[in-house]
Amino acid sequence: MNHHEVHAVSAFAMSGFEQSLVFAIDGGGDFLSGLMAVGSGTVIAQLVSFPEHNSLGLFYLETIRYLGCGMFDEYKVMGLAPYGDPDRYRELFAQFYELLDSGGYRVHLDRIGPALLRNIQVRRKGMPFTQQHRDVSASLQEALERIVFHTLRHHRKATGMTRLCLAGGVAHNCTLNGKLLYSGLFDDIFVQPAAHDAGCALGAALMVSSELGRPAPRERLPDVYWGPDLGNEQATELELNAWSGHLDIQRSDDIASSAADWMANGAVIGWVQGRSEFGPRALGNRSILADPRPAENKDRINAVVKKRESYRPFAPSALEEDASEFFELPDGTRQLPFMNFVVRVREAKGNVLGAITHVDGTARLQTVSRKTNPAYWDVINAFKKRTSLPILLNTSFNNNAEPIVQSVSDAITTFLTTDLDGLVVGPFLVRKRPASLQDWSALAASLPPYASLHRVRSHIAPDRQETVCEIRMGHSAHSSMRISPELFEILMRIEGEASLGSLFDTALLDQAKREDLVKELRLVWELRGVRLHPLHAACRHDNVQSGT
């Protein structure tokens, strides 16, 4: 099996189609950058493959390097593109690719850098985006769409296939997918929810299963809630109670109504239920949720929770049965459960949905079915009863330093290190409480597996060096954070598991210094340079016995 073949299987075998065109397209793998095939029954017959030097993924990546972005930042530029005008650099981008006969194309990756260096002010990471950068983003997105449409039109006509499956990293370009949806080129489109390389594992497993005589049922994939389960209620409550100095915890007999009350009154909350999602999207089990109406909710979540660029859009989750009232869905389209398509917000509703309507009047919609996720459907429906709006703002439950939360522990950590107003875990409503120095001192500190302590000589001026202390994240000195010598010494004392209080006692620190170190630790914890967590029960008992 090869890279793009398993991409193709991951989409076609989950689509529910008996026959379809299958387009797998990404940055590269096994010296190719994609393939076009026809799926029929349990067989996928390749029509054409695309060499790595014609990679559309690399075409996108090579361009965004000059916008201060790197690998895996493609989605940021996709979100920036609607702020730009593609006319400005259309002729420039026309030099970077050719549309060939029979649906072929040629990409000139070597022309991109020199041309952009001559024509734009290159952006460094962290600098503001200018209108020039927005226009480059728009031209890039338009060029990608032109190439993909050119290829698909040819193969649609040549094969007569009326359905399409998409996989590969480029298939996560939701703007492109939305254009395909509205084009009418295909009667139905299925995009593998884990279109990136994680989906290759699924495709490989499906291929082997089919070869062993156990092909996947020809059914449409209903959901991807395949990750770790939250656990039983008793275990969840025990874990929450271990943070009792930091959290107020209340069990609700109607968690959907309680959460909806919070959001209807302006709260931005973490929502954690059941099994986590497979793939890159939070689809209602590991989500940050909020009222989709106030535009300031978008600004607030970007600034104080996600701590990311202010232009970045948020997605709506809408009840499946009500979605068409608020969004322009093509005829026959009712279910969009995986946030794979950007769709138009109805003009009359755009002003109402200020937090989820992008600058071009679109949104990356998730429709929610009562059958596939009853808990999430219930909370949206409860919000509808209070506001007449069957929609919530939904974004992944994480900060800018970590992936999406999985466990109760992850959820608590992210809740305590962001400005979320509340947390819902299973049937429990959780709020923050002001923690005392004693509460913080009762926690244990440890270094994550990817972090290490270093004391190094560093230039603080061209002619002056001094010794500095830092935590390195991974193996690169470029991914490091400076810490005080006092915190360095405390972290160096960690052996096994001990409370911060006992470490402070060993270092003979006064109260003022302890307060300073707790404040610094909380900042480092927010960036995941250290872990703070309750002591295990046995260790808590030992510390009580020793008087700490």
From Swiss-Prot:
Pfam families: Carbam_trans_C, Carbam_trans_N. Its EC number is 2.1.3.-. One of its GO terms (biological process) is biosynthetic process. Keywords: Nodulation, Transferase. InterPro entries: ATPase_NBD, Carbam_trans_C, Carbam_trans_C_sf, Carbtransf_dom, NodU/CmcH_Carbamoyltrnsfr. The keyword DNA repair does not apply. The keyword Coiled coil does not apply. It comes from the Bacteria. One of its GO terms (molecular function) is transferase activity. Belongs to the NodU/CmcH family. Involved in 6-O-carbamoylation of Nod-factors. This is Nodulation protein NolO. It comes from Bradyrhizobium diazoefficiens (strain JCM 10833 / BCRC 13528 / IAM 13628 / NBRC 14792 / USDA 110).
